[in-house]
A protein has these predicted regions:
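Active-site loop/oxyanion-hole signature of alpha/beta-hydrolase fold enzymes
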Residues: 49, 53-93, 265
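Flexible "cap/lid" loop of the alpha/beta hydrolase fold
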Residues: 112-151
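Conserved alpha/beta-hydrolase catalytic His-Asp/Glu region
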Residues: 148-201
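Short beta-strand/loop motif that positions the catalytic acidic residue
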Residues: 214, 220-222
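Conserved hydrolase catalytic core segment
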Residues: 84-128
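Conserved alpha/beta-hydrolase "acid-adjacent" motif
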Residues: 227-232
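Conserved HGGG/HGGXW glycine-rich cap/lid loop of the alpha/beta-hydrolase fold
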Residues: 9-60, 77
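Catalytic active-site module of serine/aspartate enzymes centered on a nucleophile-bearing elbow/loop
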Residues: 243-275
Length: 275
């Protein structure tokens, strides 16, 4: 697939493919966009618009780094290309962001594809942390806890966050030999602020309260062996009228990496059911 680079304000991204328009929203938060392979997988289904979110190189952008600001950026990208409505295809934190768009701006969406997303329930974090505890050494776990404490205190550095991803990265894959490279840049302030915004919305139960009113098609695709527990996705999907869930076997947090074609196949079957 041939992609073309674009700049929309401070955001740097790429567009390509053919079909219905779709925003591709990466996870992290505050890491460079890594969804090129997913865009390639979906190139015959969607015209994709993917970009690195604000506050992280190669994109710029000043604060605020909140869920609201990231939603506004997504709509700005659509506006820049004259797209009235699009699919929101998000992975991990990006899937969570897509669900917020569904609640706050359904008039700008055609539907949502949430790939191994952070769901609506804060309790999933405890199980995710427990899974990492089993997979990492005590020293690695202690270092992750130390860095996370510094992030919560607003004192973390980019180098520490890059180290954090390097330690935790193998746990995102069922087969570590298939792991893609971890991020080498993290927007430190963006990471701090997005996580604070996440906590605020979890406490306000934004998605739990808003998703039952959704009236657009929503597909969840989740790795069977992901560090994010499958129940987080199935229970989040249970809040959305008519939502469908596909669990990808022998896959961790990146289904399109460990089981190439799995996300495309799920989307194609889902679209066929809408016709």
């Amino acid at each position: 697939m041939r992609e073309r680079a674009f700049e929309v304000g401070p955001l740097n991204g790429h567009r390509g493919g053919s079909g219905s328009p779709a925003l591709l929203l990466h996870g992290g938060a505050a890491v460079p966009d890594y969804l090129a392979d997913l865009a390639e997988e979906l190139a015959d289904t969607f015209t994709t618009y993917r970009y690195t979110q604000r506050g992280t190189p190669p994109s710029g952008g000043e604060p605020p780094y909140t869920i609201e600001a990231h939603m506004a950026d997504a709509l700005t990208v659509l506006d820049a290309f004259g797209v009235d409505r699009a699919w929101a295809v998000g992975h991990s934190w990006g899937g969570h962001l897509a669900l917020h768009l569904l609640v706050a701006h359904p008039d700008r969406l055609l539907g949502v594809v949430a790939v191994d997303p952070l769901g609506a329930f804060l309790e999933a974090f405890a199980e995710q942390d427990a899974a990492r505890l089993r997979a990492l050494s005590p020293g690695q776990t202690a270092r992750l806890d130390e860095i996370e404490a510094r992030r919560r205190a607003g004192k973390v550095t980019e180098a520490e966050l890059v180290e954090r991803f390097a330690i935790a990265w193998p746990t995102y894959f069922a087969d570590r030999k298939k792991a893609i490279a971890p991020p080498t840049h993290v927007g430190a302030q963006a990471s701090i602020d997005v996580n604070r915004s996440l906590v605020d919305h979890f406490e306000r139960r934004t998605l739990i309260r808003g998703l039952p009113a959704a009236a657009l098609p929503v597909l969840f695709v989740h790795g069977e062996l992901s560090v994010i527990p499958v129940w987080s996705t199935t229970e989040t999907a249970g809040l959305v009228p008519g939502a469908e869930v596909v669990v990808v076997g022998n896959s961790g947090h990146f289904p399109w990496v460990e089981q190439p074609g799995s996300v495309r196949n799920a989307v194609e079957r889902f679209h066929a059911g809408l016709e």
